[in-house]
Amino acid sequence: MKLTGISAAVVIFATAAIANPITPGEVQFDEYGAIQASLSGSDGDAANGAKIMTNRGKGNCVACHAVTALNDAPFHGEVGPTLDGIADYRSAEELRGIIANAKMTFEGSVMPAFYKTSGFIRPGDGYTGKGAKEEDLTPILTAQEIEDVVAFLMT
């Protein structure tokens, strides 16, 4: 009986540890900018990823990238590469890293870091007359939203 209780506790704690998202400050990029582990600890939802990619208040990926599967969304951009067939030459780990912080893969990229909270250049007083806030910012996307976008791109 005790063994069953202990086993159940181990399973509960192990499940909780897996489900805890990796915070932006804990993200580990490899030497090429890829992130090996899921940021949320859960699989992504491709349907929600498509919504995030077209939502102007969230990812808005189509503002810079053309995506044939999302043709219903207006105003596809041409700043970034087309995302059609990207799963043919990028892994989920590479896509996760690029979405989290593209500058870890492409140093001069103009793509925003969607899962970064610190390390930004803040001009402050010199340009606005107001001191720049020093606290961390909120990431543009959550860990699960990044996994959702990766799931969509891998379809």
Residue spans of the language-model regions?
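Sequence context surrounding c-type heme c attachment/ligation sites in exported
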Residues: 47-62, 72-77, 127, 136-144
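N-terminal signal peptide c-region/cleavage motif recognized by signal peptidases
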Residues: 14-16
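Sec-dependent signal peptide recognition
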Residues: 2-9
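Second-shell loop/turn segments in exported
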Residues: 35-39, 82-85, 135-139
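Electrostatic cytochrome c docking/interface patches
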Residues: 21-56
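The canonical Cys-X-X-Cys-His
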Residues: 49, 57-68, 95, 149-153
